[in-house]
C-alpha cells in the first residue's frame, strides 16, 4: 500500500528557536489525519539550517507523538551525521536518511559512495537515501544507489517519474518514494511505495484521499483532486514555497506554526494576502467535495 509521508515543517519562534510545542501539535494533527510517516529535518523542515543539536531536538519532540519517523541526519560534516545516526539508537524509529553532501562541486562518485556506506555501517536503523539533485548538485541515481548497496529506501525529489521508477527496476527490494507532490496519483498507480509530499503539511486530507482514490482505481476522481492540489503547490511557489508552507498550514489547518528561519524569511502581509487570495477558491471546492470542513 503506497504511503503518504510528510516532510514535517520546523516551527521557529520569533527569536529563532525551535518551537517544540507547535511542532508536536502539528505532528499530532498529521498522524490523526492519516499521514503514514513523518520525515524529520528535510528540506521543508529547513534541515540544512539546523545544527546537529537542533536536529536531535526535532527528533525528540516528534518522537513524543509518534515513532513513525525517518530521521534526516545529513550535512557537510560527516562526523556530525555519524553522531546523530548513533544517537538514534535510543529511539525506536523507522530509519535514518541523508541527502548527498551539497555545495562542494565535482565530488567524485567514489567519495559520495563512501559517505553513504559509512552512514550505513554505523546506523542502528535502516538507511534511506534522500536524492534531491536540484538542491545538492549531485544525482545519486539508481545505478549509484545499487553500487552503494545498503539502502532500505529512497526519496527521489525529481519530477521525472522514469528516474524514480529506475530505483525499483535496479533495486527491486528498495522502498521507492517520489518527492513530488504532483505525482501522488501517478505513484499510487505505478506500484511505487508512496510520496514524501511537502503539501501534506497543509493538505493532509487531500494527499491521503488522492492516494486512496488512485488505489481504488478511481483515476478520474484522483486526478481531479490531484490537479486542485497542484494549483495550491503552484501558488506557493510564486512567493517561495518554503515560506508559503507556514501561511498555508495556518490557512488550511487552522493553527499557527510560527516562523521560518532566515534566509527563508516569512512572507510579508501583502504576500500573505495575495497567496490566500490565490487558494481560497480551491479551498471552497475542497469543502464542496467534503474533503475539508467549513
From Swiss-Prot:
Catalytic activity field: 2-dehydro-3-deoxy-6-phospho-D-gluconate = D-glyceraldehyde 3-phosphate + pyruvate; 2-dehydro-3-deoxy-6-phospho-D-galactonate = D-glyceraldehyde 3-phosphate + pyruvate
Residues with site note (Proton shuttle): 130
Pfam families in the cross-refs: DHDPS
InterPro entries from the UniProt entry: Aldolase_TIM, DapA-like, ED_pathway_aldolase
NCBIfam families per the UniProt record, alphabetical: Arch_KDGaldase
Complex and partners: Homotetramer; dimer of dimers.
Protein's UniProt name: 2-dehydro-3-deoxy-phosphogluconate/2-dehydro-3-deoxy-6-phosphogalactonate aldolase
Amino acid at each position: 500500500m503506497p504511503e503518504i509521508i510528510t516532510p514535517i515543517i520546523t516551527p521557529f519562534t520569533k527569536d529563532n528557536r525551535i518551537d517544540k510545542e507547535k511542532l508536536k501539535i502539528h505532528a499530532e494533527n498529521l498522524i490523526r489525519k492519516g499521514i503514514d510517516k513523518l520525515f524529520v529535518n528535510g528540506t521543508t523542515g529547513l534541515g540544512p539550517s539546523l545544527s546537529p543539536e537542533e536536529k536531535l531536538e526535532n527528533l525528540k519532540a516528534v518522537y513524543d507523538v509518534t515513532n513513525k519517523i525517518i530521521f534526516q541526519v545529513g550535512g557537510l560534516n560527516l562526523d556530525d551525521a555519524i553522531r546523530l545516526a548513533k544517537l538514534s539508537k535510543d529511539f525506536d524509529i523507522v530509519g535514518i536518511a541523508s541527502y548527498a553532501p551539497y555545495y562542494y562541486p565535482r565530488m567524485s562518485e567514489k567519495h559520495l559512495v563512501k559517505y553513504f556506506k559509512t552512514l550505513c555501517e554505523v546506523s542502528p536503523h535502516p538507511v534511506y537515501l534522500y536524492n534531491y539533485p536540484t538542491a545538492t548538485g549531485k544525482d545519486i541515481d539508481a545505478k549509484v544507489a545499487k553500487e552503494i548497496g545498503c539502502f532500505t529506501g529512497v526519496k527521489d525529489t525529481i519530477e521525472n517519474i522514469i528516474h524514480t521508477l529506475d530505483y525499483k527496476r535496479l533495486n527491486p527490494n528498495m522502498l521507492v518514494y517520489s518527492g513530488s507532490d504532483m505525482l501522488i496519483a501517478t505513484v499510487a498507480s505505478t506500484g511505487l511505495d508512496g510520496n514524501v509530499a511537502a503539501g501534506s503539511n497543509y493538505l493532509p486530507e487531500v494527499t491521503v484521499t488522492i492516494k486512496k482514490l488512485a488505489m481504488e482505481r478511481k483515476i478520474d476522481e484522483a486526478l481531479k483532486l490531484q490537479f486542485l492540489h497542484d494549483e495550491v503547490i503552484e501558488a506557493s511557489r510564486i512567493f517561495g514555497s518554503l515560506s508559503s508552507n507556514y501561511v498555508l498550514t495556518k490557512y488550511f489547518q487552522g493553527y499557527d506554526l510560527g516562523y521560518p528561519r532566515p534566509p527563508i524569511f516569512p512572507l510579508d502581509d501583502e504576500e500573505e494576502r495575495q497567496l490566500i487570495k490565490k487558494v481560497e477558491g480551491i479551498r471552497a471546492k475542497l469543502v464542496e467535495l467534503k474533503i475539508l470542513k467549513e
